[in-house]
Amino acid sequence: MSYFDPETNEKITPTVIEPAGGLTRTLFALLCSCYDEEEVNDTTRTLFRFDFNIAPIQIGILPLSKKDELIEVSNNIKNILQENYRTEIDVTQSIGKRYRRQDEIGTPYCITVDFDSLEKNTVTVRDRDTMEQETIPIDDLSKKYSEFE
């Protein structure tokens, strides 16, 4: 596409430069770069590998069952952690399905509250990326996550 300028006797081809940027493109790029699928035990595990600081939910709290004692400990942990972190308590379905659901929404860490939490005052912390689990005292939870701030 060009035109002829009769005043200068030149053929001109216009150039269009459209610099565009926006939140939508940035967000889409982030989602694409964090999306991952991997094979685990003959099934496909879908997850978002969000950095701890930008994850919509930073720490998922998963009581092993709906027993009142475990829910109470879970709520106490949430009250401690929600001052500095985005947390969510999930009590629906089996623990394995809850782990998968938290992986799919990009939650970097899940805390499992089980009967050892009642007896020994400990919880199991699971890392989304490595799927490794460690047992730590409930009193050490704030210290564990402070390294990500």
What is the predicted function of each stretch?
Residues 1-149:
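NTP/phosphate- and nucleic-acid-binding module
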